[in-house]
């Protein structure tokens, strides 16, 4: 009321913004022009202008996403150690693989399932590993984690 012409912007960058690789969800009230605010956040990564409802959804996916990725990275590194690799090499290999796969998905525009199919051979090693991960519930655990994050965000927002 004190500032009737003021526009409220809400932004949710994630922690990779600190190295210029962030993902920021941005919303503004009253369909305001977001050009200037988008430019600010583009300096630290990518920006998605979304509705208020989608801001919380994107927060559950990409705002909290680095935490999920670090758990996956740590698990992959532990797997590398389990099969005999030195820890630092396992961490580097897992991190570079995650980085490369993410970059490949972004730059190619190809659906992740197709990219996955391109690296799996019938009866091969990759599909054996994916099968074991699927049997262990990896896919549903990741989905359930994002849903739980959104539910908690909604609770905190009340």
Per-region residue spans from a language model:
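Internal alpha-helical scaffold of NAD(P)-dependent oxidoreductase catalytic cores
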Residues: 4-7, 23-58, 69-107, 150-152
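Short beta-strand segments
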Residues: 10-12, 27, 120
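NAD(P)-dependent Rossmann-like dehydrogenase/reductase catalytic/cofactor-binding core
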Residues: 95-158
